[in-house]
């Protein structure tokens, strides 16, 4: 299957090695973001922190879902994840979402917003690269992009107090756009 699928994508003019690099870097970013959001969520304390903990949890679980949805496509195209977790983490297309030195709620929100803005850029690039050429990867990247834009809007609204128009939330980790790509659902 990977050889046939890969040839079909290559025939459209896509450099599959470049696409795999983009997808692996995106998967690494989602994986590391899940880890760092776990730490950030645990440091969202006090009354202000309790108010945003579930929102961080929602983004964290959806980012894990993004990782889980990207991995099958990587293998379908004949790629694979690195065997070494450290090597994999170093490939992430976005900076690590480290806990800030001063872990105030405002500083945590700034880290979260920066991470989501990077993710929006990553999936916009993948969508632009695959549009009209690789419908499966495009559909997947677009679904993830929808969720990353929502995450960005959530954190921007919480940080600035200005309405974002994107405060759709269901139960944490619901992934309304990406869930169709997850094999466990």
From Swiss-Prot:
Query: Under what name is this protein listed?
Result: DNA protection during starvation protein
Entry keyword annotation includes Oxidoreductase = yes
Q: Which reaction does it catalyse?
A: 2 Fe(2+) + H2O2 + 2 H(+) = 2 Fe(3+) + 2 H2O
Provenance organism = Pyrococcus furiosus (strain ATCC 43587 / DSM 3638 / JCM 8422 / Vc1)
Q: Which GO terms describe its cellular component?
A: cytosol; nucleoid
> Which purpose does this protein serve, as stated in its record?
Protects DNA from oxidative damage by sequestering intracellular Fe(2+) ion and storing it in the form of Fe(3+) oxyhydroxide mineral. One hydrogen peroxide oxidizes two Fe(2+) ions, which prevents hydroxyl radical production by the Fenton reaction. It efficiently oxidizes Fe(2+) in the presence of hydrogen peroxide and stores it.
Q: Which SUPFAM superfamilies does this one have?
A: Ferritin-like
> What EC class does the entry list?
oxidoreductase
Similarity comment: Belongs to the Dps family.
InterPro entries named in the record: DPS, Dps-like, DPSL_diiron-bd_dom, Ferritin-like, Ferritin-like_SF, Ferritin_DPS_dom
Q: Where in the cell is it found?
A: Cytoplasm, Nucleoid
Q: Gene that codes for this?
A: dps
Oligomeric form and interacting partners: Homododecamer. The 12 identical subunits form a holow sphere unto which the mineral iron core of up to 300 Fe(3+) can be deposited.
Picking any one GO molecular function of the record gives: heme binding
Q: Where does Fe cation bind?
A: 30, 66, 116, 148, 151
Biological processes annotated in GO: intracellular iron ion homeostasis
Q: What is its EC number?
A: 1.16.-.-
Q: Which Pfam families match?
A: Ferritin (PF00210)
Cite the entry's keywords alphabetically: Cytoplasm, DNA-binding, Iron, Iron storage, Metal-binding, Oxidoreductase
